[in-house]
């Protein structure tokens, strides 16, 4: 009897220390995406130190205030995502988790909308095909914007699933999507600091 209890306790402890497969899949995706962003940022600085002037003549230096505010807003959306993972423990709290994710998604969508507007505005000022600065600048921003858009698709999926009730599978999905947003927010900080480097 004592050995059965010990084995059961050891099994529970092992289960607590392991993560579901979905979590590991997201961790691997994030690792590969971190490599992508690391390569893009390294390319930015490689090109920067090869160029006699950065940005090149005729290209305006990036403005600082709005990108920093927008990044702060994106980072702030991790708070309701985290809170949703914490409250989504019982049936009565699924609704609260749903509203927290919906709040985060609405703010994230607003962030993406403003960023796309700024992206289009920058395209009118200089071209990605004109020089190395334009190429890496627009590539870095476009890749980050694509990650935000993918996150919004994930938000929509989990909102639809949470609307149908909470299961262990959906709870894992919620945690994995929150994990993804933590990464996107962290990368957003790196991207905006790289983008603003000439103006800092």
Cite the ranges covered by each PLM segment.
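...captures the hydrophobic TM-helix bundle architecture rather than a specific catalytic motif
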Residues: 1-200
């Amino acid at each position: 009897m004592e050995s059965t209890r010990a084995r059961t306790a050891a099994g529970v402890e092992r289960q607590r220390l392991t993560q579901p497969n979905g979590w590991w899949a997201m961790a691997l995706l994030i690792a590969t995406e971190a490599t992508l962003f690391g390569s893009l940022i390294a390319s930015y600085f490689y090109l920067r130190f090869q160029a006699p002037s950065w940005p090149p003549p005729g290209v305006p230096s990036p403005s600082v205030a709005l990108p920093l505010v927008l990044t702060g807003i994106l980072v702030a959306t991790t708070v309701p995502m985290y809170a949703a993972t914490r409250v989504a423990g019982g049936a009565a709290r699924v609704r609260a988790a749903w509203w927290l994710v919906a709040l985060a998604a609405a703010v994230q969508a607003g962030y993406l909308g403003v960023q796309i507007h700024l992206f289009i505005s920058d395209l009118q000022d200089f071209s990605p095909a004109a020089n190395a600065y334009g190429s890496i600048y627009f590539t870095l921003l476009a890749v980050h914007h694509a990650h935000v858009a993918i996150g919004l698709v994930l938000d929509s999926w989990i909102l639809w699933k949470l609307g149908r009730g909470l299961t262990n599978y959906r709870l894992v999905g919620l945690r994995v999507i929150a994990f993804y947003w933590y990464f996107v927010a962290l990368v957003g900080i790196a991207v905006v600091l790289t983008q603003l480097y000439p103006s800092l």
